[in-house]
């Protein structure tokens, strides 16, 4: 590590040095359909200064053409749709193997906190999930809350999935030093989710607050919220709470 000046990765993103602010900026890749800036929001100024994303200036088609021209055996490899280290899509199984712990059954609760059934283990569920619950009800039920500490999963109607505000911790800002005053941004709450207009600010305790113009469906604790100003990543954090609307 001490002998390297730069690390080069294949992420679809760009790094630009802004002379006016004296900061390195993280920008979206030019191929918006492949942009990966969302997963890079926690890079520091020091890391950005020594990182290059050459494919960020290219489309996926152009990358394939270059790979084919240079005889790469994977030039025509289909795009991956899953996490690269979980190729079979069995996320719960991966967590069990990685942690060495098996998931425990627990209580399904309704929105009043009353038990209505038994779940297979919290790692098998995600906010907004409808299929595979094994619960019969006169109306569709969705996962609207997960509490690992209590080993409970809360089920509710579609109206219970919407939140207008969230907070986030482990905040990293890239384009600025602070967000003491509210600023207008485009906020993204998951990798494939369209950015949404919002207002964002940080409180003195370092917590990021985001208020959306319109309620958002299935804001999920533990996921990243990433803020954009056009093509530039302002920063982001790990979602710690969502206020139901």
Regions found by a protein language model. Give the residues of each.
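Nucleotide-activated chemistry modules centered on ATP-dependent adenylation/adenylyltransferase
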Residues: 1-233, 237-245
């Amino acid at each position: 590590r001490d002998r390297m000046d730069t690390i080069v990765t294949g992420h679809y993103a760009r790094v630009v040095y802004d002379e006016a602010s004296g900061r390195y900026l993280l920008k979206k890749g030019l191929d918006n359909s492949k942009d990966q800036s969302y997963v890079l929001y926690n890079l520091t100024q020091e890391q950005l200064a020594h990182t290059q994303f050459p494919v960020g200036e290219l489309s996926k088609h152009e990358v394939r053409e270059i790979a084919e021209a240079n005889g790469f055996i994977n030039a025509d490899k289909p795009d991956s749709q899953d996490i690269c280290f979980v190729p079979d899509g069995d996320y719960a199984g991966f967590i069990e193997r990685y942690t060495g712990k098996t998931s425990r059954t627990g209580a399904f609760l309704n929105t009043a906190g009353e038990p209505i059934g038994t779940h297979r283990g919290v790692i098998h569920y995600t906010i907004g999930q409808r299929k595979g619950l094994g619960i019969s009800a006169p109306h569709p039920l969705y996962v609207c809350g997960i509490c690992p500490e209590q080993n409970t999963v809360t089920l509710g109607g579609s109206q219970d999935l919407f939140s207008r505000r969230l907070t986030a911790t482990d905040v990293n800002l890239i384009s600025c030093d602070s967000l003491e005053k509210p600023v207008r941004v485009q906020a993204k709450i998951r990798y494939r989710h369209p950015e949404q207009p919002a207002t964002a600010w940080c409180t003195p305790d370092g917590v990021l607050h985001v208020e959306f113009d319109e309620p958002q469906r299935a804001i999920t604790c533990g996921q990243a919220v990433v803020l954009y100003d056009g093509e530039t990543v302002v920063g982001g954090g790990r979602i710690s709470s969502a206020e139901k609307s």
